[in-house]
Every structure is written in C-alpha cells, then in structure tokens.
From Swiss-Prot:
Gene, per the UniProt record: PHOS34
Positions with biased composition (Basic and acidic residues): 251-260
Key word Transmembrane helix present: no
Protein residues bound to ATP: 18, 80, 170-179, 187-189
Native organism taxonomy: Eukaryota, Viridiplantae, Streptophyta, Embryophyta, Tracheophyta
Protein's recorded name: Universal stress protein PHOS34
Length: 260
C-alpha cells in the first residue's frame, strides 16, 4: 500500500472463493506470518450490516451508525459477491454483462471485457467506501466478502458462522403500500427474516412518496421506515412484525415504535 495514499485503510478485507462454507475444508498450504488482533474480538455485540453496493446499503450503514450501534459494539460489513450476476438496490438479479454483438469480437475499438480480478477489486473498493461512516465514528469493524450464487442462503449461513447478534440490511419500498400481493418483504430480506438465527433489521430507503425532509432542520433527511423481526419457532405469525419510524437525522435519536 502507498503510505502517501489518502484512501483509508480498513482492516481484514476478505474474499472467500468457495461457493459454500460446506466446501471450505481445504486450507491453503501457506502459513500467516503473524497473528493480528481481530477488530471485532471481545465486543459486547457483533452487529452485521449486509450490503449490496447500492445507495440503499450506504443509507443502512449510516442509519446503523446514527441509531443502532452503541459503544462496546463491533460491526461486520457482510457482502455476498455473486458468481454470475450483480444484485441491484432491490436485491434482485441484474446481468453482470450482456453478450457483445457479433461485430464486437472483431472491432478493434471494442472495450475489453473486465476480468474477475477487476470485479473483485471493484467490489472491495465499493465495500470499503460503504464502511467509511464506521471508521469516522470510531466503531471497530471488519469487512467480510464471500462469493456464492445464492445470496439469500449464504447471508444466513455467514450470519450464523460469524455469530452475529443482529443483521441490518437496506431496502427500497418494502412499506405496506409497496409490499407484494402476499404482504411479504422482498425476496432476500424476507428469506433472511425467516431463516437467519438472529434478529434482522430492514431499513427502508426513503423516497419521494415519503414526503419532504423536515423543514428548518439543516442536514435532516426524511424518516426511515424500519422493520425489526426476530426469528422464533412460530415465525410465521404476524404479531412478530414490528414497524418503527425512526428519524434518520444524526441529531435526533427518538424512536417511535408501533405494533402492526
């Protein structure tokens, strides 16, 4: 690393290549030169923030710093990098790249296809950017990047493997007026709510339907709609679902909780 670089150093950025933890029994023959302290070791709570490189994820990180993470906590920024597709802000699949037209193969001016190494470097850089609010707030944290074709299952597997106390994830449009016909959350957040072993906090990114930001409050934003769900043996019951409207401005930490 260039010591004169302005880019912030973030500890323990990992990219795990096995498609599943079940196939990770083969260890590298290389031996680490020295054991380094884990930033999350000894924390009172280990909070995971699942990110997908979107503005919704950036909002969820900022919300977690302002309203959820407390002194004594440590944070794991968790990203599942898809093996064949990119996942957009709504946690839905988008093609990683479309096949070039036949003429592109012989066009000397055609852009070269990015390599897997390019994509890995881009992913690490974007996730590091998302973690900046944690560094600025002084919360101990690490970045954990894994690869899998099934984002939903892998998020739940990593949540259990990392022994997280709670997982926070961002989402756009999961409010009552935007839910599916069955009233469920989005596919990934809904899966995590019902399969993660710890509570899942889904932070809805506010949009124009939520109205303007509060007047006269410099730096204020519209309120975030937050759904908190805990997994229980009877987790199909509606009475587990609690919605909260929480002001996203850092200066206001009053929470208004209501049961559905």
């Amino acid at each position: 690393m260039n010591p004169d670089s302005d880019y912030p150093h973030l500890p323990n950025i990992k990219i795990h290549h096995p498609s599943s933890p079940r196939h990770s029994h083969h260890h590298s023959s290389s031996t680490p030169s020295a054991a380094t302290p884990t930033p999350t070791a000894g924390a009172r709570r280990k909070i995971g923030v699942a990110v997908d490189l979107s503005e919704e994820s950036a909002f969820a990180v900022r919300w977690a710093v302002d309203h959820y993470i407390r002194p004594g906590d440590a944070v794991v920024i968790l990203h599942v990098s898809p093996t064949s597709v990119l996942f957009g802000a709504d946690w839905g699949p988008l093609p990683l790249q479309t096949p070039p037209p036949p003429s592109a193969a012989t066009d000397p001016g055609a852009q070269p296809k990015p390599s897997q190494e390019d994509f890995d470097a881009f992913t690490s850089s974007k996730v590091a950017d998302l973690a900046k609010p944690l560094k600025e707030a002084g919360f101990p944290h690490k970045i954990h990047i894994v690869k899998d074709h099934d984002m939903r299952e892998r998020l739940c597997l990593e949540t259990e493997r990392l022994n997280l106390s709670a997982v926070i994830m961002g989402s756009r449009g999961f409010g009552a007026e935007k839910r599916g016909s069955d009233g469920k959350l989005g596919s990934v957040s809904d899966y995590c709510v019902h399969h993660c072993v710890c509570p899942v906090v889904v932070v809805r990114y506010p949009d124009d339907r939520d109205g303007p930001a509060p007047p006269g409050n410099v730096g204020a934003t519209r309120e975030a709609i937050v759904t908190v769900k805990s997994r229980r043996d009877d987790d199909d019951d509606d009475d587990e679902d609690h919605e909260a409207k929480i002001a996203a401005a850092a200066s206001d930490h009053h929470e208004h909780i209501k049961d559905e």
